[in-house]
Amino acid sequence: MCICHVCKRPTFLDHQGSQHPGAPFGAPVGDVPEASVSQLYEEARRATAAGAYTAAVLCCRMLLMHIVVAKGAAENQTFLAYVEFLANKSYVPPEAAEWIDHIRKRGNEANHEISISPRTDAEDLVAFCEMLLRVIYEFPARAKRRGGGLSGAT
């Protein structure tokens, strides 16, 4: 047993060299004002680290719903309506629409079918959600702290 140098909590390596509990997948994202959004993202990160990949995929699906409602969409819409809201309000670049649709499809599979989500799906979706949170929350907050723009911008 060891003590993690980051969180200062106990951790151990099993006979295969795997760390338990594992470090959360992805990186923390700052400046997210909605507690539910931040909590769901962290839950998806921890679920991925724990090998609970289907749970992580479902968290990412729910996370997108929370983001969209926080940004002004009506509650109790279809997931497709939420995906379209993100695209129509330019919260994601056109090239990212394919990723949003990927989350929709993987989330639907995990939510409505008898299936198990693989590690790759969970990691891809958490990484996409991390990027989305940075674009929607973290980078605008950074710019605001710097006085509304980045230094050297013309």
Identify what each model region corresponds to.
Residues 1-53:
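Charged alpha-helical initiation segments
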Residues 43-46, 50, 69, 88, ...:
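General structural signal for alpha-helix termini and helix-helix connectors
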